[in-house]
């Protein structure tokens, strides 16, 4: 079994928020490593900086979160997988098939497309629209 994690799930592992306890609990049963696309890596960096901008965290908390994330990458808990070119074709198909019904955003369909192209069987997210899309495409969403 392989797993793909989106930004909402991963950020909750590194920054205390309303989903942190759920993320930590789910990590106990995750089949490692978690796959992450370069898109997710950019989103995580941006999410950390948004917390600073919104004054939800200070610089030292951001640095600590970044350090933990880098350690998980270095230790193979999270593996950065190249964004396959086919992901864009799959994302376009997902948008045409599901967006009118689910209201998914571009990045939602791209994350799910990445998971599908990378042959993930499980998709970790706290985003409700991504959850519905991933389930509609046959991914397991705990």
Report each predicted region and the residues it spans.
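Short, well-structured N-terminal submotif of metal-dependent ribonuclease cores
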Residues: 1-43, 47, 51-64, 137-140
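A local structural micro-motif
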Residues: 35, 81, 123, 140-142
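Active-site-proximal, substrate-binding regions of enzyme catalytic domains
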Residues: 39, 45-94
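Generic secondary-structure boundary/loop-capping signal
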Residues: 7, 11, 36, 75-80, ...
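A generic local structural motif
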Residues: 20-22, 67, 109-112
């Amino acid at each position: 079994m392989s797993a793909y994690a989106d930004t909402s799930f991963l950020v909750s592992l590194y920054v205390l928020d309303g989903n942190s306890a759920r993320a930590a609990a789910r990590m106990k049963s995750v089949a490692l490593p978690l796959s992450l696309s370069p898109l997710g890596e950019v989103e995580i960096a941006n999410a950390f900086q948004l917390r600073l901008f919104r004054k939800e965290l200070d610089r030292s908390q951001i640095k600590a979160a970044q350090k933990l994330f880098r350690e998980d990458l270095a230790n193979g808990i999270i593996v950065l997988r190249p964004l396959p070119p086919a992901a864009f074709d799959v994302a376009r198909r997902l948008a045409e098939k599901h967006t009118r019904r689910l209201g998914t955003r571009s990045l939602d369909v791209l994350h799910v497309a990445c998971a599908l192209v990378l042959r993930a069987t499980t998709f970790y997210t706290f985003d409700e629209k991504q959850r519905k899309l991933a389930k509609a495409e046959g991914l397991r969403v705990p």
